[in-house]
From Swiss-Prot:
Species of the source: Huperzia lucidula (Shining clubmoss)
Compartment(s) where it occurs, according to its Swiss-Prot or TrEMBL record: Plastid, Chloroplast inner membrane
Gene name for this UniProt entry: TIC214
Family as reported in the entry's similarity comment: Belongs to the TIC214 family.
Matching InterPro entries: TIC214
Membrane topology category: Multi-pass membrane protein
GO annotations of cellular component type: chloroplast inner membrane
Listed name of the protein: Protein TIC 214
Pfam families: Ycf1
Keyword Cytoplasm annotated: no
Subunit comment: Part of the Tic complex.
A single BP term in Gene Ontology: protein transport
Length: 1658
């Protein structure tokens, strides 16, 4: 709803200026009315309760009370006493809690069997109760709500638009409509409850009543949490003892409202304690500025002033009350008309003075005679006195006088004492107003207020005398004289001066002593002297008098209890007098002292532990305990041993740290509604940061192991990269440990709150007791009984010993051991951990070493001999030492969880418990292996005794091992099949190895290492790819060279033996058959082995080839991806760089082109001269056509061209200006020019490069502008230089008197110049708002000029344009004259140091726009000649303007002819061509030279000459004296209207557009005139007339006439800006705020803050 409200307000503000504003306010009022009635608050809940319990009559009464409360709230806006009485925060704060407590107490005891009776008539006793409850709760609704922003916002809106009658009426209808809708909804709810409820309706009423009482109690508790009443707090007793002479503090009843209950200076309720500094200076501010708002007269109207004195406001109100001055009705005559008349008269006088000065300028008066001068004090010889003794200057510009330290020199008496003596004498004279006020005061018997001229009472006189003595008896001088003296403005010394001389302090002491002597006479001291005291002294004096009267009241009360004859009337009179004391002295300043807390609070620099008497809360601790250093075997604490303190701070947000105990708490802000119970408060601003995931940071050890060369890897690379996270090596456990630590801390922080500790602590303790005393004993008993049943020896002793070693240590939440028998303190709030030392693990049997140790312990040593005893002892000690060393090597411990599991650390990973049946299964496997080994051994024995076993020794048991086990080792280092022999033959066959050459004859289960080497071609790929299949292992079968020879020889020998045995086979037929059968079986086994070998090779080869192929693909893909990313990045960087470079070049080029095209077309077109008969060639010359084309026209044609499916040459020629071309077929000729310069070779105009444009520009000599034209391209810079010139002239004094000594002036000349600069800056700052036409049109002059002046300037411009074209009839040789202009001697390096006639044309090749090497070299060659030559330069000037115009035409024609004849030397044109030509023509003039020219010869200044520098330094001071006698020749076509055109003594009429009219006035008069013209003293009816009349008395012109005259070149915005005066701008008064309104906050816009809301006009 609030969002809808803001949108509606924005719509109203936007639609405010339109005529339909009343309709929008009506809609907004209706919306506001519904919002004020419909939200469910406490009053609405009470209305629902009244309808449900009291019927329709009770509900109607509740609604009436709610409407009445809303009406009172709205009336409080119009009538402030209602707001003070009912709605003021101080009063309503005290009323809320008692009323809610009373209401809750009244509704809580209603029984279920006594439901409330409905209200049937208005005579019922419940009528008044329901109405008052609804009325009061509607008033308290904005306070009781948990978040009253909505209700207060509505009140703010109605306060904003309370002056709109349409809004008030519509909001009233909105309230009524909202309440009617609310009543109908309640009735519908009642019907639904009666119809749908299955419970008895009276019982429902009782339940509703009980629920409502609960709601009231909850809201009351919420209110207590929000704003507790600061009545009963913990006092902080200060250690200082009160002095006997100290004034007794006023009692509680003497304090005014609301300070009596809500005192912001309540020293015993600080929020945070800030300790004083080492020097006793507290960082807390001692006082702050406090604004006092009051009405005052400003600009002829009543306005709000925030710098008014409370004393003056109080005196004005009391004087109006006692003199019965009635309020002046709005219909009567305005009391400020006299002030308006005076200010209007001053404004008219100032305007008339300025008008007269302007008219004098129009009448050909010199500006030096018209300009206003400052009056200065001088003697009869016109010697101006120094500024220190000039009374016409303010004291800020006089400087400060350095008082001599010599005791023989005495200063004169300050002028302030003389002024005060005069003021005292004037006050003694008769004053008619004073007598009249005194008579009226005596007639009305108003003795409560003392008049200023009345003498002091005896008590007041004694107090004043006491203060004077205290000031005069000070031993040490104070640096702040305003604290010493009683008067506000005694001396000129400011507050920031740190030292003061003894003589000045002696003067002050003499003055205070004189004041003390004058106070001895009772008649000379009155209340006016008290008012002249400083603010602090006045306040101290008033409090002193107040305490004196309070002492009198206390003495009277003592007599009252002692004397029973005192009347009640006297008592009431004294009480009234006591409470009226503070109304008599209300003289205060606008500075409010800040509360200062006591510095005796017990506070320490660090968070001290174990101290309970501190006055400041320290950081919240948790798990605080004492850890003892000496612990026995059972970890029992010995109280006599030393201990150390272990402290750990809470991880939760600690909002009460550094708070003074007993101080008021602040609410937790920036908390979301759904996170009100969260552990750590986070503002919504930081929620988005919490949602961002933190990237995983791989440790350095792990990152070094991961192969960064191939990121996209197959299974082999993934195995190398990820297996280290889960491997068992020491280096590879680092990452897993760090990752687990992070997760463990996260879980611990999530469970670190009180409710979780309650739910976790109890199950943890129960699990500890169950494990120690239930589970483990049951397992021990079951195990030993099972051993007995299995006819094994029970192990009762071993098991119970291990059970007794298991110790459960109670620890803090972070795992710090505390105690074995006791739980930590506050374990249910701060958490608990249980650490198990030597945890018990149930085993089926114990270790053999333990058994040997126990067996040896049970042996009797006496039964052995000496040798046996030594051997037995050594055996016993060795076994025991080995066991104890293994036991002490590492203490086994774990932490218990609530599920009974064990972890290695709190909230860590679950430890893997040893499996009980694992030793049993292992033992069974060993037995099975042993049985199989015996069977194999028996088979071997049987085979040895076989009859044919001795003849056929091919596979003897000594050579061929028995096949006992074939397994595949799947470890990470072995990927081949490995043969594992029997335990018995393991040592014999460890060195048995084979070769790949006789692999066909090998039995099953043996695979050589060479079988892994697939081929020479793939071996390198395998090693590069994974490196797994080529790794050597200790378990691989590797053949030996000697063994290979022996086995081969033995094999062939056995084969030969078998062939020899064929002869004998006939004798033994059965043996031959068996041998053949064995050979067949062997061959069959060989084929199987060969097949398995091939299949294994194929599988390995396939896998390796796949891995190698995928590795190559991934490596190539990764490389290409990196190349692609790198290429894109480089491409993007180059693209952005080129964009910026091209944009800068284009912008720079277009800016220069636009300036040349729009502002300086006059100078560009001067050289465009077309000859008719003479010098005209029938053939078109390309360079001649180029010179006839302007650069601006070229760029303009390119911009206007359309490049889509068309040739830009046609569009270029379409928009071309035909005026610049000669003859016919200009398109063809222009095409030839463009083709020669390489412009047509480009496909599109936007593809033209910089070189193309440079080639084009090199053909245009008009693009090389001289320096006097470039100075006008940047007029703002030129104007700034002129402004600097004026600053330099104003900074130096007008006259320097050497006869008067200046030893007492401590201000240096540099400081005085800085002050004058600041003054000039302020004047320009205020006037800059009038310089509004900085970018005005060139073709038209300022609109506020007269018609006659406009005509003169238009004619002049027309003449200039006519000079651009030359007719053939005017080319008469008799009219050939030359013009010589030597301008801009500020740049002597651009001129040639020789005797020539200087001309503008000579300067053109020296400052070309395109910097060429030839010009640079030419300049370097002439540099030495220019520095050494100091000859005179002759300059001539024509006496006739017409002669100059004709000579200029002919000179341009001659110059054009020279250019055509010397095309190759066009760029670097020699300077002597035109000089020689002019000398030739000059020689033809003969005797007419003297009549035509004026000699203006001068010498070039030396660059390095001390005399010249000295002259320039001294002449600067002379410029200020003759500042109006030098002419600053500026261009007519400057951008700004205000210009400085200072006329020479020749006397010539100047226009007001060439200079600043306000320069003829002094800065002080300028500002006065501007401020007097700003206020609208006569209203808005004469505003149009003022605008038509103009500012400086110029001829009036209406808006219509101005628009008609300037229709083509100016728009309406320019017209409005040029007539806009500072009275319609806020910036001008804002800039003058600090100087005219005396604000002290340093902000220029302080006055603008008074208007808090924008106004909406009907």
């Amino acid at each position: 709803m609030l969002s809808v409200l803001w949108v509606l307000i924005s719509w109203i503000n936007i639609s405010g200026p339109i005529p339909n504003i009343s309709g929008s306010l009506t809609l907004f009022g209706l919306y506001y009315g519904f919002l004020a009635a419909l939200p469910i608050g406490l009053s609405q809940i009470l209305t629902i309760r009244a309808f449900l319990l009291g019927g329709n009559t009770g509900g109607t009464l509740a609604v009436s009370g709610s409407i009445m409360g809303q009406l009172i709230t709205n009336l409080s806006i119009y009538y402030w006493p209602i707001y003070v009485m009912l709605l003021k925060p101080h009063a309503i704060t005290l009323l809320v809690l008692p009323y809610m407590l009373f209401y809750w107490y009244r509704t809580k005891d209603l029984l279920y069997d006594q439901p409330p009776n409905p209200v049937e008539s208005l005579n019922d006793a419940q009528v008044r109760q329901i109405f008052l409850d609804s009325f009061i709760l509607s008033l308290l609704n904005p306070v009781i709500l948990p978040s009253p922003v909505f209700a207060r916002s509505l009140n703010l809106f109605i306060f904003r638009y309370s002056n709109k009658i349409s809004f008030v009426i519509s909001s009233s209808f909105g309230w009524l409509g909202g309440y009617i809708l609310f009543i109908n909804l309640i009735k519908l709810l009642m019907v639904r409850i009666e119809r749908d409820s299955s419970v008895n309706y009276p019982l429902i009423k009782s339940i509703i009543n009980q629920i409502f009482s609960i709601i009231i109690l909850a809201l009351r508790l919420l209110y207590l949490g929000r704003a507790p009443v600061p009545l009963f707090t913990k006092k902080i007793h200060d250690g200082f003892e009160s002095d006997e002479n100290q004034i007794v503090k006023s009692l509680w009843l003497n304090k005014p409202w609301p300070t009596v209950l809500f005192d912001y200076r309540k020293w015993n309720r600080p929020f945070r304690y800030i300790q004083n500094g080492p020097n006793g200076d507290s960082p807390v501010k001692k006082q702050v500025s406090q604004y006092f708002f009051d009405t005052c007269s400003s600009d002829g109207r009543q306005r709000i002033s925030f710098t008014s004195l409370p004393s003056s406001s109080t005196f004005q109100k009391d004087l109006k009350e006692y003199l019965n001055i009635s309020e002046i009705s709005p219909s009567s005559e305005d009391i400020y008309d006299k002030w308006i008349h005076i200010e209007e008269k001053r404004k008219n006088n100032s305007n008339d003075g300025l008008t007269n000065r302007v008219q004098a300028l129009d009448n050909r008066f010199l500006m030096i005679n018209v300009t206003e001068y400052r009056n200065e004090l001088c003697d009869h010889k016109e010697n101006v006195s120094i500024k220190t003794y000039d009374p016409f200057l303010n004291k800020g510009f006089r400087g400060k006088i350095a008082i001599s330290e010599s005791p023989w020199i005495f200063d004169e008496k300050p002028l302030e004492s003389t002024r005060r003596q005069i003021m005292l004498n004037i006050s003694k004279r008769n004053n008619k107003l004073k007598d009249w006020i005194y008579i009226c005061w005596q007639g009305l018997e108003r003795k409560k207020l003392s008049l200023p001229w009345e003498p002091l009472t005896p008590d007041a006189f004694n107090s004043f005398n006491l203060i004077a003595k205290e000031v005069s008896n000070d031993e040490e001088p104070r640096t702040d004289l305003k604290q010493v003296d009683f008067y506000e403005e005694q001396t000129l010394v400011t507050l920031d001066e740190q030292n003061i001389s003894s003589e000045l302090f002696a003067t002050v002491t003499e003055h205070t002593n004189d004041l003390h002597e004058r106070t001895t006479t009772k008649s000379s001291i009155n209340w006016e002297h008290v008012l002249n005291l400083s603010s602090k002294k006045r306040d101290y004096y008033s409090r002193y008098l107040e305490n004196i009267k309070w002492h009198k009241l206390l003495n009277y009360w003592k007599k009252l209890f002692l004397d029973s004859s005192t009347k009640v009337r006297d008592t009431l009179f004294l009480i009234t007098q006591a409470f009226g004391i503070r109304n008599e002295y209300q003289v205060q300043d606008v500075v409010k002292e800040m509360p200062r807390w006591t510095s005796k609070l017990a506070n320490y620099k660090f968070d001290v532990i174990g101290i309970t008497f501190s006055d400041v809360r320290y950081r919240k601790l948790k798990n605080f305990d004492y850890v003892f250093e000496t612990v026995d075997q059972e970890i029992e604490i010995e109280t006599n041993e030393p201990f150390r303190i272990v402290k750990r701070f809470s991880q939760q947000s600690d909002f009460r740290r550094n708070l003074v105990i007993g101080s008021m708490r602040a609410r937790r802000r920036k908390t979301l509604i759904w996170n009100s119970l969260q552990l750590k408060t986070h503002s919504p601003f930081f929620l988005r940061i919490m949602d961002e995931t933190t990237p995983l940071k791989i440790p350095l050890k792990v990152s070094n192991k991961i192969d960064t060369k191939s990121t996209f890897t197959p299974f082999t690379k993934i195995k190398q990269g990820l297996i280290p996270f889960f491997s068992d090596s020491d280096d590879e456990k680092v990452f897993a440990a760090e990752k687990t630590e992070l997760d463990r801390l996260t879980i611990a922080n999530k469970w670190d709150f009180a409710s979780a500790h309650w739910g976790r602590g109890f199950p943890l303790v129960i699990q500890s007791y169950l494990r120690k005393y239930v589970v483990i004993p049951v397992l021990i008993i079951s195990k030993n009984i099972s051993r007995i049943l299995l006819f094994q020896v029970p192990e009762w002793k071993e098991d119970w010993n291990e059970w007794s070693k298991e110790i459960h240590v109670k620890c803090n939440y972070d795992g710090t051991e505390v105690s074995v028998h006791q739980l930590p303190s506050l374990w249910h709030r701060e958490g608990l951990q249980i650490k198990i030392l030597y945890p018990f693990h149930l085993k089926p049997w114990h270790n053999s070493k333990l058994r040997q140790l126990e067996f040896l312990d049970n042996l009797d040593i006496k039964n052995f001999g000496d040798g046996d005893e030594i051997e037995k002892t050594l055996l016993y000690d060795g076994i025991k030492d080995s066991y104890t060393s293994a036991e002490r090597k590492k203490i086994d411990y774990s932490y218990l969880t609530i599920w009974g599991n064990q972890t290695d650390s709190p909230f860590g990973n679950t430890k893997k418990q040893p499996f009980f049946w694992k030793p049993v299964i292992k033992e069974l496997r060993k037995k099975r292996k042993r049985i199989l080994s015996k069977i194999t051994q028996n088979f071997k024995i049987y085979y040895k005794f076989f009859p044919l076993g001795q003849k056929s020794n091919i596979y003897n048991e000594s050579d061929v091992p028995a096949v006992s086990k074939t397994r595949a080792d799947k470890s990470k280092n072995n990927d081949i099949f490995e043969f594992e022999p029997d335990d018995k033959d393991k040592n014999e066959e460890r060195d048995f190895k084979i070769n790949n050459e006789i692999f066909d004859e090998l039995p099953i289960g043996i695979t050589p290492k060479s079988s892994n080497n697939l081929s020479l071609q793939n071996s390198n790929k395998i090693e590069y790819g994974t490196g797994v299949f080529t790794r050597e292992s200790g378990n691989d079968v590797t053949p030996n060279s000697n063994e290979i020879e022996r086995i081969t020889k033995h094999f062939f020998d056995e084969v030969q033996t078998n062939t020899d045995s064929k002869v004998i086979s006939d004798e033994y037929p059965n043996d031959g058959k068996k041998l053949k059968l064995r050979k067949i079986l062997i061959k069959f086994y060989q084929q199987i082995i060969r097949l398995r070998r091939k299949s294994t090779q194929l599988i390995h080869e396939r896998i390796n080839s796949i891995n190698i192929f995928s590795e190559e693909i991934n490596r190539n893909v990764l490389k290409n991806i990196f190349y692609l990313i790198r290429f894109k990045i480089k491409l993007m960087i180059n693209f952005v760089k080129n964009i910026f470079i091209n944009c800068n070049e284009v912008i720079h080029s277009y800016n220069n082109i636009f300036r040349l095209q729009t502002k300086y077309d006059k100078y560009v077109n001067q050289d465009l001269i077309v000859s008719g008969k003479e010098g005209q060639d029938p053939e078109f010359n390309s360079d001649q056509g180029i010179d006839s084309v302007s650069q601006a026209d070229v760029f303009h044609g390119v911009r206007q061209s359309k490049t889509i499916n068309k040739s830009y040459l046609k569009n270029f020629l379409k928009y071309w200006n035909l005026y610049y071309f000669i003859g016919e077929n200009y398109e063809k000729k222009l095409k030839v020019i463009l083709d020669e310069k390489g412009i047509l070779g480009v496909g599109e105009p936007q593809n033209l490069s910089e070189e193309n444009w440079k080639d084009w520009l090199r053909c245009l000599h008009r693009c090389k502008l001289p320096s006097h034209i470039w100075c006008k391209i940047v007029p703002r810079t030129w104007k700034n230089e002129v402004t600097k010139h004026w600053k330099m002239e104003e900074n130096f004094p007008n006259h320097f008197d050497e006869d008067i000594p200046h030893t007492f002036m401590t201000y240096s000349s540099w400081e005085r110049i800085g002050k004058l600069n600041r003054r000039h800056k302020y004047n320009l700052l205020s006037y800059s708002y009038l310089d509004f036409a900085k970018n005005r049109e060139i073709k038209k002059f300022p609109m506020w000029q007269s018609e006659g002046e406009q005509t003169i300037f238009n004619n002049r411009i027309r003449e200039i344009r006519e000079c651009q074209s030359v007719n053939n009839e005017e080319n008469d040789k008799s009219k050939i004259y030359f013009e010589f202009k030597m301008k801009l001697w500020l740049f002597p390096e651009l001129m040639k140091a020789k005797k020539v006639f200087g001309s503008e044309v000579i300067l053109i090749p020296e400052i070309s726009l395109i910097a060429e090497k030839h010009n640079k070299s030419l300049k370097d060659e002439r540099l030495l000649e220019d520095r050494e030559c100091h000859e005179s330069i002759y300059q001539w000037r024509r006496t006739s303007k017409e002669l100059e115009r004709i000579v200029k035409k002919l000179r341009d024609i001659a110059f054009l002819t020279i250019i055509i004849e010397n095309q190759d030397k066009f760029v670097s044109l020699p300077a002597n061509i035109v000089e020689n030509l002019e000398a030739l023509v000059f020689s033809t003039r003969g005797d007419s030279v003297k009549e035509t020219f004026q000699n203006l010869e001068f010498r070039l200044p030396r660059v390095l000459d001390d005399q010249i520098l000295m002259y320039k330094t001294i002449s600067t001071l002379l410029k200020f004296k003759n500042r109006f006698k030098r002419r600053l020749d500026l261009n007519t076509f400057d951008e700004s209207i205000p210009r400085i055109e200072i006329v020479k003594n020749g006397g010539k009429t100047i226009s007001s557009s060439y200079f600043n009219l306000e320069d003829i006035l002094l800065p002080k008069r300028r500002m006065e005139l501007r401020i007097l013209n700003s206020p609208d003293l006569k209203g808005d009816e004469n505003r149009d007339a003022e605008l038509d009349r103009g500012t400086f008395g110029i001829k009036r012109q209406s808006y219509e006439q101005l628009i008609e005259e300037d229709r083509d070149s100016a728009n309406k915005n320019q017209i409005i800006k040029r007539f806009l005066r500072p009275s319609y701008r806020l910036e001008d008064p804002a800039c003058m705020n600090r100087f005219w309104f005396h604000t002290n906050n340093g902000s220029r816009f302080a006055m603008l803050r008074i208007c808090m809301y924008p106004s909406i006009h009907d």
